[in-house]
């Protein structure tokens, strides 16, 4: 579960390496976010020459969490790290590549471009 001030690794080649959560979108007073939820974040670390610069405020979708997510069949999916992909307002990724596996829950939330770019969908 991701909340305000949580730091996440960026799983794309947009130029950002690490982001810090500012706000969880979707309802007033919402405290936590899980896989497939959109957050507003600021870039804390960035690579030189990238599309995204340090200090920039961006929207991102969570693709991996340590706490994991429960599925309809009763199984759980957990990952080794918390990671997100930086997106535009139309839910398309700002980068052109996705690194590492992503959860199947993204398909249910209509992030089709991220699912198609990902090397593995779990």
From Swiss-Prot:
UniProt superkingdom: Bacteria
Single GO cellular component term: cytosolic large ribosomal subunit
A single GO molecular function term of this UniProt record: structural constituent of ribosome
Keywords attached to this entry: Ribonucleoprotein, Ribosomal protein, RNA-binding, rRNA-binding
GO biological process: translation
Function: Binds to 23S rRNA. Forms part of two intersubunit bridges in the 70S ribosome.
HAMAP family: Ribosomal_uL14
Family recorded in the similarity comment: Belongs to the universal ribosomal protein uL14 family.
Protein name: Large ribosomal subunit protein uL14
Species of provenance: Enterococcus faecalis (strain ATCC 700802 / V583)
Name of the gene this protein is made from: rplN
